[in-house]
């Protein structure tokens, strides 16, 4: 992973995570224009996305990591992807591979438009389907290939330097576990904390 060795040698392994998630003062704090427009669409569609502050931290971390392979799960209509594509454009470089996974075919059409707008066909792969099924099919493919039998390619590649996981709180927990084997050595998986439970808290509850 480009940039990773330099980061670790400068600050030591214990400080890598804190360094990755710290704000990068050299980057704009404004939301990219395309991401802003997609954010308006999200509101009209009643969909949720990560907060601007989290998206900034993700972008800053990816900028430091300079991953050569990224897997984004739960890409939606591309709000987070627009931030990432904008970073590629500003930096003047992109990874060798950027896989976007989305369960809905209609959303995949929107993702394709975003990909074309950024001239990212050469390194972007949009995968449509249920992640649990895709992981199972990919694991089966890798098991078969280890015996010398290879037909086509797996739905999901392995050895990603960065994996981004979105979805409901329950989905995220399950998907994080199933996707850890798809990380490269030294790779980083990004997600958000579990959703806070709603409702009243019993006054006798001491937890």
Label each residue range with its predicted role.
Residues 73, 103, 167, 192-194:
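Generic detector of well-ordered alpha-helical packing
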Residues 1-69, 96:
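Rossmann-like AdoMet
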Residues 5-7, 136-144, 199-205:
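Short, flexible/disordered intra-domain loops and linkers
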Residues 47-50, 163-169:
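Short, flexible loop segments at the rims of nucleotide/cofactor-binding pockets, characterized by
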Residues 70, 100, 164, 190-191:
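Generic enzyme active-site microenvironment
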């Amino acid at each position: 992973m480009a940039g990773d060795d330099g980061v670790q040698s400068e600050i030591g392994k214990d400080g890598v995570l804190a360094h990755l998630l710290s704000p990068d003062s050299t980057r704009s704090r404004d939301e990219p224009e395309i991401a802003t427009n997609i954010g308006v669409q999200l509101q009209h569609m009643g969909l949720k996305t990560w907060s601007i502050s989290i998206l900034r931290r993700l972008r800053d971390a990816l900028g430091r990591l300079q991953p050569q392979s990224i897997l984004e799960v739960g890409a939606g209509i591309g709000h987070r992807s627009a931030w990432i594509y904008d970073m590629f454009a500003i930096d003047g470089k992109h990874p060798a591979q950027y896989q976007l996974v989305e369960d809905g075919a209609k959303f995949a059409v929107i993702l394709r438009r975003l990909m074309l707008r950024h001239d990212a066909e050469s390194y972007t792969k949009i995968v449509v389907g249920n992640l649990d099924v895709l992981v199972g099919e990919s694991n089966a493919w890798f098991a078969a290939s280890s015996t010398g039998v290879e037909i086509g390619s797996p739905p999901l590649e392995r050895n990603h330097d960065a994996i981004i996981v979105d979805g409901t709180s329950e989905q995220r927990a399950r998907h994080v576990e199933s996707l850890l084997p798809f990380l490269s050595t030294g790779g980083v998986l990004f997600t958000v904390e579990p959703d806070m439970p709603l409702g009243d808290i019993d006054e006798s509850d001491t937890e």
